[in-house]
């Protein structure tokens, strides 16, 4: 990292208190979630071109045409997932690894799947830099889930499914929770599926969101 880039990141981090206040004002109030966000260096996950915007409450571009999510959405989704310290969490779409890192700080184990090999390798390097020992990665089709490790206490999907993600829901424990953006258009609904213990789910629509689509298969040559 160049000296100029380091300086930009340091200046951007001065915006952290403003970001944390914005999250609280928008309803992200869970102390553990807020602590996880506050102690995670978002600038580690943003490209050099955007280091000076690392602590903005906005989504930013990363490699492979993907994005690192807006901190508010990261906080909202993590809070809605109601993760417990002993939870085993499945994340669909590792991306930069930022959301993965937040989840790793509030759960026991995080299993994360990414369809872009480039993103997976970059995220794994960041996990090593941070010394994370409770993250297990997989290069593969996130829409298929991770049946070998199921059932999970919690599942988070960070790309938009066209309809209810039934295959993923089938990999939840009976009282598990899944949070995912759902919809075919540019604007989707963020939904929370809570297992009722009897094979059914209570579905709550949290808000409108904009996510990249959940694509089948793995990316070629990326």
From Swiss-Prot:
Keyword S-adenosyl-L-methionine: yes
Biological process annotations from GO: methylation; protein modification process; protein repair
PROSITE patterns: PCMT
GO molecular function: protein-L-isoaspartate (D-aspartate) O-methyltransferase activity
GO CC annotation, single: cytoplasm
Major location category of this protein: cytoplasm
Catalytic residues of the enzyme: 69
Entry annotated with the keyword Cell membrane: no
Cellular localization per UniProt: Cytoplasm
Keywords, sorted A to Z: Cytoplasm, Methyltransferase, S-adenosyl-L-methionine, Transferase
Catalytic activity: [protein]-L-isoaspartate + S-adenosyl-L-methionine = [protein]-L-isoaspartate alpha-methyl ester + S-adenosyl-L-homocysteine
SUPFAM superfamilies per UniProt: S-adenosyl-L-methionine-dependent methyltransferases
Listed EC numbers: 2.1.1.77
InterPro entries to which the protein is assigned, alphabetical: PCMT, SAM-dependent_MTases_sf
UniProt cross-references to PANTHER family, sorted A to Z: PROTEIN-L-ISOASPARTATE O-METHYLTRANSFERASE (PTHR11579), PROTEIN-L-ISOASPARTATE(D-ASPARTATE) O-METHYLTRANSFERASE (PTHR11579:SF0)
Role this protein plays: Catalyzes the methyl esterification of L-isoaspartyl residues in peptides and proteins that result from spontaneous decomposition of normal L-aspartyl and L-asparaginyl residues. It plays a role in the repair and/or degradation of damaged proteins.
Name of protein: Protein-L-isoaspartate O-methyltransferase
